[in-house]
């Protein structure tokens, strides 16, 4: 559906990049590539240096070195930043891009929002990923959660159904159990029929509770999780997890 004079943004680290490049060339499209490691790409991430709550990040863009300040809560979204820069340089000159281009960008609610939940003497850190879920976004969110709180012994996840996967639903819900089993999550709680397939493939010591309704979810959060825990909640928007979190 790309017009003949259009552009195609391609991740050069992706295993299908050569396929997409060949297709784009056949259509005579403008090709812009990005990469975290391949310096032959048009937009390349070269490194970072931390300064308090932000990072000074170095990029190679169309052969020119460019620096941008990135907030610490965005530093794990490197592919998103690279693809955004690729789109921007298709329309604007590199020199016109300010260093603080990304500095005031805020993550949309329920796409990794951090909630400091307090109930009496109990304090929890909730990472709200309840806007949507698919195997790729689940793995990304899980890896980031595991990394950001690697020193904690109180890491929990609550997962809801990944919807709109069609005939592959069962297979893909089983697949994400492999990601969880390789992580350092303490317990995994599930909500929804498809997530039971995930639950059954988890290591026994990583299995938490199978939750059946809103009341059981609220009871888990308010009463059962230990103080100073970290909880990531991930599921498709229509599972209702999003509404439950909003009303905490």
Task: Locate each region found by the language model.
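Flexible phosphate-sensing "switch/lid" loops adjacent to ATP/NTP-binding sites
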Residues: 1, 20
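ADP-ribose/adenylate-binding Rossmann-like module
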Residues: 8-12
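A short, compositionally biased
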Residues: 49-56
